[in-house]
């Protein structure tokens, strides 16, 4: 009985791992930010709960498809070789059915508790990541994460539209921030894992153009990100608190990118990658704090 329970528990964990829960949580933080930034009043509990649940389920479904398509690549890379599909703990067909179930349930929740526009935008994001990026761009071009990054940048727009019911300039600006953040975030990881990507024949920028070229582009995109992150203040979407935070966080990111560009230390790339995660989290927290501070003035 104990053995059977341990197998079932492991299988449950395997399916949870397929959804990339840590990535989904970061996406939902930006979705939540989009929801609260969209209104000067409170967000209804049904939209808050079921809207984010629907977005999260669809994101999880897209992640499962990514695992299925990349299972052979994952088996070749040290970072991913222990994933459930790469090790054969979960078969492709059950995984695809699981992905379909997640996506369908997520779409139903969005259609029932938010609005049709949110549901269709979420579906477009899902297909962009699971089909366009995973199925084609990842293996086709070193600009894969630049083009495919748009799908991953959608959550704040989805959260905003779930509350407002329409698309406006402000949520598109939030999308632009994540879009500019994506290349330095992923290219830093790609430098750290360059040999693994080369072994798996994935044309990441460090593999096709070299580390020096990639580091320069990380630096350039970080400069673009710093400029873009100041736009919410420029259009009076946010106030001085956000401006100070965006400058401090952005300049620190720029320092990481500069150190990476100038340094040959092996840990500089992974340090930049890790900072980029905290950067995005802190930037959206700053947006929220500033938003509600302005409302109370």
Swiss-Prot record:
Molecular functions (GO terms): protoheme IX farnesyltransferase activity
The entry's keywords: Cell inner membrane, Cell membrane, Heme biosynthesis, Membrane, Transferase, Transmembrane, Transmembrane helix
Disulphide connectivity of cysteines: none
Broad class of where this protein is predominantly found: membrane
EC number: 2.5.1.141
Pathway named in the protein's UniProt entry: Porphyrin-containing compound metabolism; heme O biosynthesis; heme O from protoheme: step 1/1
InterPro entries xrefs: Protohaem_IX_farnesylTrfase, UbiA_prenyltransferase, UbiA_prenylTrfase_CS, UbiA_sf
Membrane protein topology class: Multi-pass membrane protein
Gene3D superfamilies to which the protein is assigned, alphabetical: UbiA prenyltransferase (1.10.357.140)
Locations listed in the record: Cell inner membrane
UniProt record, GO biological process: heme O biosynthetic process
Catalytic activity of the protein: heme b + (2E,6E)-farnesyl diphosphate + H2O = Fe(II)-heme o + diphosphate
Transmembrane regions: 23-43, 45-65, 93-113, 117-137, 145-165, 171-191, 216-236, 241-261, 277-297
PROSITE patterns: UBIA (PS00943)
Broad EC category: transferase
Entry GO terms, CC: plasma membrane
Misc remark: Carbon 2 of the heme B porphyrin ring is defined according to the Fischer nomenclature.
Function: Converts heme B (protoheme IX) to heme O by substitution of the vinyl group on carbon 2 of heme B porphyrin ring with a hydroxyethyl farnesyl side group.
Family, similarity comment: Belongs to the UbiA prenyltransferase family. Protoheme IX farnesyltransferase subfamily.
Protein name: Protoheme IX farnesyltransferase 1
Gene name of the encoded protein: cyoE1
């Amino acid at each position: 009985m104990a053995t059977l329970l341990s197998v079932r528990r492991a299988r449950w964990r395997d399916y949870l791992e397929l959804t990339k829960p840590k990535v989904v949580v970061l996406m939902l933080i930006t979705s939540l930010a989009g929801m609260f930034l969209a209104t000067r009043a409170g967000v209804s509990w049904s939209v808050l709960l079921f809207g984010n649940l629907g977005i999260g389920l669809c994101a999880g479904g897209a992640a499962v498809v990514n695992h299925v398509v990349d299972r052979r690549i994952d088996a070749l890379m040290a970072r991913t070789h222990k994933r459930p599909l790469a090790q054969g703990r979960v078969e492709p067909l059950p995984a695809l059915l699981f992905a379909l179930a997640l996506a369908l349930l997520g779409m139903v929740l969005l259609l029932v508790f938010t609005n049709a526009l949110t549901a269709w935008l979420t579906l477009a994001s899902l297909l962009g990541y699971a089909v366009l990026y995973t199925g084609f761009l990842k293996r086709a071009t070193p600009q894969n994460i630049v083009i495919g990054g748009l799908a991953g940048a959608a959550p704040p727009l989805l959260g905003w539209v779930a509350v407002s019911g329409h698309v406006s300039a402000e949520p598109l600006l939030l999308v632009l921030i994540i879009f500019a953040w994506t290349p330095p975030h992923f290219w830093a990881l790609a430098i750290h894992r360059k040999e693994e990507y080369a072994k798996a024949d994935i044309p990441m920028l460090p593999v096709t153009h070299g580390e020096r070229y990639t580091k320069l582009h990380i630096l350039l995109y970080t400069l673009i990100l710093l400029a873009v992150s100041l736009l919410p203040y420029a259009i009076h979407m946010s106030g001085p608190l956000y401006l100070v935070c965006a400058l401090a966080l952005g300049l620190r990111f720029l320092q990481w990118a500069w150190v990476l560009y100038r340094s040959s230390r092996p840990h500089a790339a992974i340090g930049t990658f890790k900072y980029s995660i905290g950067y995005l989290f802190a930037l959206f927290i700053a947006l929220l704090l500033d938003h509600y501070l302005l409302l109370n003035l």
